[in-house]
Amino acid sequence: FEKLPVIVVSAFLDDGKLSAGGKYLIKLDVEGVEIEAIKGGARLLQGDSVLLCEEHGNDRHHTVSRYILEHTPLKLIVYDPRSNRLETVTELSILDRIKVSTHVGYNVFGTASAFWQDRISALNAARRAQ
């Protein structure tokens, strides 16, 4: 195995690579260490950021989504094919209905940002108008 450096996402704020006042979409693709990455990015996620990560279809416990709901201030959002909208997840049971295939990943979003929540609401409004 090759050793790879680990960088805490919030360190990008400390070294000036990211502005604390910026608006960010953070795509996590970290194959099994999503919770650790979310912990490492906690400071960045407090600002105008939205997190995009994959909820694996074979994870019937919804581990990443459960962590976001129970241990972070983030609102959890998922695309619901039944309503054709991005829905705020308040109970994990909606994921039981949405995650129908065990070999597919399902995107979930987490944000505490009014900026991103407004954009998601606008997307849903545009879908209703179609």
Question: Model-derived features: where do they sit?
Answer:
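Short aromatic/basic micro-patch
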Residues: 3-6, 109
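A contiguous, well-structured "functional interface" segment within a domain
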Residues: 1-4, 15
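Conserved acidic-Pro-Pro-aromatic motif
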Residues: 12-129
